């Protein structure tokens, strides 16, 4: 059975409460998430020998998350990754977005979802966070209502589900910007770790990390 505790972790510069949720299962594994940026703060899991370690990177104090350039563990949007030159065309209309990464638009702008307080609530063994992005927010068309659902169970499985509704055709690409170190935070480099992604295709990017729009076959890639 998963138990969920919550407490006020700190305050934003604007005086909003930052809530920290701790989800703990019967095996002693736990996940901590915050309503600031709908962020994963820590994931403490047993390794193959049963030794517990925090396997994601995070900050010990909430102030570390204020406009954190690495967006550690945060939910980013409206659009994760880059939009070239901060310009996009939707249904024949051109929209200009904030340029916040060299000459490009990154992760939805400076005041993207990673740098906001989300509404949050507990539902049985899950935490649900939500926010409303108004029409024109960061230059995007349409009001966007977003939910991030964090599920944790006694098999040590953590699942995030993102849901979005909009009243206009728009661009939405939500993700969580978590950094893993399966040997434990602070244990050293992850360059010798092996990762398997159950994906059949990969989105091609150019040398500026801008998506080209081409979907490439993932078969045979490293």
Write out the residue ranges for each language-model feature.
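An exposed, glycine/acidic-rich loop-and-rim segment of catalytic or binding clefts
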Residues: 1-222
């Amino acid at each position: 059975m998963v138990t969920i505790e919550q407490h006020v972790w700190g305050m934003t510069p604007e005086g909003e409460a930052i809530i920290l949720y701790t989800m703990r299962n019967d095996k002693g594994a736990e996940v901590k998430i915050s309503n600031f940026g709908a962020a994963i703060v820590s994931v403490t899991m047993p390794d193959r020998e049963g030794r517990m370690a925090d396997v994601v990177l995070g900050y010990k104090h909430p102030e570390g998350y204020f406009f954190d350039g690495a967006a550690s563990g945060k939910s980013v949007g409206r659009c994760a990754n880059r939009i070239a030159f901060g310009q996009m065309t939707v249904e024949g209309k051109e929209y200009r977005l904030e340029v916040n990464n060299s000459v490009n638009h990154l992760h939805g702008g400076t005041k993207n979802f990673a740098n906001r307080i989300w509404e949050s609530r507990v539902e049985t063994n899950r935490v649900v966070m939500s926010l409303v992005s108004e029409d024109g927010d960061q230059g995007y068309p349409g009001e966007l209502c977003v939910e991030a659902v964090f599920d944790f169970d006694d098999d040590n499985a953590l699942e995030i589900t993102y849901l979005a509704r909009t009243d206009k055709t728009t661009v939405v690409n939500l993700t969580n910007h978590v950094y893993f170190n399966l040997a434990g935070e602070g244990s050293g480099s992850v360059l010798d770790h092996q990762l398997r992604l159950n994906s059949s295709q990969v989105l091609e990017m150019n040398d500026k990390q801008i998506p080209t729009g081409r979907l490439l076959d993932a078969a045979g890639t490293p």
